[in-house]
């Protein structure tokens, strides 16, 4: 299983997680020239940008630890572009992280959803 496949499994799990909790997924893999946002969703008057980090082991630490300050700032800039381009208005904009650990077979062993992560 390559990194792209691992990432897709994590994103698929996260979309299912969000949908089952009443979120409406608006976009997946929203790209601009300098990066992307994995998932953009809404729930009521809240617009949520979700960074999904998926790993098969903890050799490099917990998945959430790889969302650096630089990565957070890049996501915020992409979010600004998204809101401006779509001309959206929400009472709240939130940045969440989904951290997932997979088994060697690609099954979700552990996950943690962090609302308002940054």
From Swiss-Prot:
Q: Name one GO molecular function term.
A: nucleic acid binding
| Cleaved signal peptide residues | none
Pfam families (alphabetical): UPF0102
Gene3D superfamilies to which the protein is assigned, alphabetical: 3.40.1350.10
Q: Which NCBIfam families match?
A: PRK12497.1-3 (NF009150), PRK12497.3-3 (NF009154), YraN family protein (TIGR00252)
Q: Which family does it belong to?
A: Belongs to the UPF0102 family.
> What's the protein called, per UniProt?
UPF0102 protein Dtur_1530
